[in-house]
From Swiss-Prot:
This is L-lactate dehydrogenase. One of its GO terms (cellular component) is plasma membrane. It catalyses: (S)-lactate + A = pyruvate + AH2. The lineage of its organism: Bacteria, Pseudomonadati, Pseudomonadota, Gammaproteobacteria, Enterobacterales. The keyword Lipoprotein does not apply. One of its GO terms (molecular function) is L-lactate dehydrogenase activity. The active site is at 275 (proton acceptor). The gene is lldD.
Amino acid sequence: MIISAASDYRAAAQRTLPPFLFHYIDGGAYAEYTLRRNVEDLSQVALRQRVLKNMSDLSLETTLFNETLPMPVALAPVGLCGMYARRGEVQAAAAADAKGIPFTLSTVSVCPIEEVAPTIQRPMWFQLYVLRDRGFMRNALERAKAAGCSTLVFTVDMPTPGARYRDAHSGMSGPNAAMLRYWQAVMHPKWAWDVGLNGRPHDLGNISAYLGKPTGLEDYIGWLANNFDPSISWKDLEWIREFWDGPMVIKGILDPEDARDAVRFGADGIVVSNHGGRQLDGVLSSARALPAIADAVKGDIAILADSGIRNGLDVVRMIALGADTVLLGRAYLYALATAGKAGVANLLDLIEKEMKVAMTLTGAKTISEISGDSLVQELGKSLPAALAPMSKGDAA
């Protein structure tokens, strides 16, 4: 198969992966309205083409948390990467490291912190949920610090699991799920050999290290469901801020007031995110939420964004809407499932090339020159009437 764009990796991943794994990452919550809008809204952000600007000295470099990055991109935390490729977290981290961008290890990774961190040169980031088991949280933070992780990404939009109906049909959960997964693996021999057999153990490495026993897929679903904490508030984050002395990023912000609270709390960054449409269906797409948040806190805190980003053009759009850096999730996982480290490396090269084309044709020589002036109109004003936000008089 010819891979010429990030979308090609999605098609290839669907052929490679057992359905329960493909649909787990490809799907969203409820009817997947927000999942679709993440992509659709971003795709309709119209860029302002400029010409004859002498773009020979174009640069994608940016600075984030006192580090220079070759482009404003990092790999987002994605659970179960090690089920999508053999020791998937190690391969994805290696690709990010070679490119010089951050890799974020998920709490629910297959490969534990101690397996991934020594394989790369630059410090990785670590993502943590707020869980009932504060002992696990402290243990994870201590291990992340010991491994040299530089930045903590604290996910706050999962006080309760989202309702992901697709998982019940695909075999990730629901009746007879284990049997469905077995037969799906049999029908996908390449994955079964490379990952299913040779990619073992499939423990949730960070959780197994804490519990002192193996944890499989069923444990993942049950342990997380029982440990999400709906009582979470900003006060619960105070002891983490005291414990963690590196940059701390709050992931899951969609409202300007929550962004202001993050500034008051003393966070170093936020991620404008709806969890890729996997939590509450019907909330704003990240592209729609971002401009108001940028208006509220730009310059006071680093603004990262995810959800709906599929290519380099989308990266430029998010920067123009107000982000400082973006996180890639699904896009890199499709590439990882298709071709491992080489797939992720190629995806990052594609995104870099697409960004250079977009910046050249919008007259932005540097990342700092990408702004609202790079857009024809702000998102919402340039959308077709059917997609534009309803006025009060239009509301049913």
